[in-house]
Design a protein with these regions (language model features):
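ATP-binding N-lobe of GHMP and related small-molecule kinases
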Residues: 1-72, 86-98, 267-268, 279-298
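Short beta-strand scaffold segments in enzyme catalytic cores
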Residues: 1-2, 17, 112-115, 119-122, ...
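Short alpha-helical "patches" and their helix-cap loops
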Residues: 13-14, 98-104, 158-166
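Short alpha-helix boundary/capping segments
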Residues: 35-38, 75-76, 170-173
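Short, well-ordered alpha-helical segments
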Residues: 41-44, 82, 227, 263
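Gly/Ser-rich oxyanion-binding loop with an adjacent helix/lid
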Residues: 56-140
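C-terminal nucleotide
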Residues: 135-298
Length: 298
């Protein structure tokens, strides 16, 4: 279970595609991508839960591909386990609702429980499944994903947060303050108030990173380019552009703005030295089955 209430928006340019092939026998320890070996156990556990639910013994070969960096603080595990939960259950002959899939995916990644829903969803602390807050067309938001480094991060999100919870004096205050921020975010989304949403989002992100910086030893995800992009966002806001930053457990910056300002924001943060590239995303749909084989996607 996650330790605090969480809000979430699904975006259309951060997509994971998963493909499953049933095979009579397979070595469940086989790893196609050694850089993701730490996820293998969770993948097997999810497949085992699906097999038990469908009363199957069949093994599966899994291919999962993101169109955004993996293990870099961009919610690749959330997207990945959401996609796998849907693909695995359909391959097993199960037709589960999004709510039931959310319950299944949550055991692998709390954030995956929210990623199944398009638009805006929430996962209250301790809940088994996420709930939809608003559809994607409720609020004309855009997220400018600003990539500040290449490659995976040195410390995984789960490892970093467990260490922070165990050693940081700022962890408990952050968690205690989360319900207030959660209500601010929820009301802001329902009322279409980007100012209120952005302020709460920035506050939450900074509290999280402050707690990690105070861990012993410190968990440091923010890089010089990260800080420079944050400064650029504040500059844009001082000039009247509604732009607000957030960072997950990683160095990349996600800039929240309105759709009409997204191109200008992307151009501005893209000029910051060290920025690799930017991706403009809008609200995305529910997780869905596709005929496109992820192995054919570049």
């Amino acid at each position: 279970f996650q330790c605090e209430d969480g809000g979430w928006a699904a975006f259309d340019k951060n997509v994971t595609r998963s493909w499953l092939e049933k095979v009579p026998f397979a070595d469940h320890n086989a790893i196609l991508d050694p850089t993701c070996s730490d996820l293998t156990a969770r993948v097997v556990e999810l497949l085992d839960r699906v097999r038990a639910r469908a009363n199957l013994a069949m093994r599966a070969r899994v291919v999962s591909r993101n169109d955004f960096p993996t293990a870099a603080g961009l919610a690749s595990s959330a997207s990945g386990f959401a996609a796998l939960a849907l693909a695995a259950t359909r391959a097993a002959g199960l037709d589960l609702s999004l709510e039931e899939l959310s319950d299944l995916a949550r055991a692998s990644s709390a954030s995956a429980a929210r990623s199944l829903f398009g638009g805006y969803a929430a996962l209250p602390a301790g809940a088994h499944r996420a709930e939809r807050v608003a559809p994607g067309d409720h609020f004309p938001l855009a997220m400018v994903v600003t990539l500040t480094t290449k490659g995976p991060k040195a410390i995984g999100s789960t490892q970093g947060m467990q260490h922070t919870a165990a050693t940081s004096p700022y962890y408990a205050p952050w968690v205690d303050h989360a319900p207030k921020l959660y209500e601010e975010v929820r009301r802001a989304v329902l009322e279409g108030d980007i100012e209120r949403l952005g302020v709460a989002m920035e506050h939450s992100a900074l509290m999280m990173h402050a707690s990690m910086l105070a861990a012993s030893p410190a968990v440091i995800y923010l890089q010089p380019t990260t800080l420079a992009v944050m400064a650029k966002v504040r500059e844009l806001r001082s000039q009247g552009t509604p732009a607000f930053y957030t960072m997950d457990a990683g160095p990349h910056v996600k800039v929240l703005t309105l759709d009409e300002h997204a191109a200008r924001v992307a151009a501005s943060v893209g000029e910051v030295p060290g920025v690799e590239r930017t991706i403009i995303s809008g609200p995305g749909p529910d997780a869905a089955i596709t005929d496109q084989d992820p192995r054919s996607v570049a």
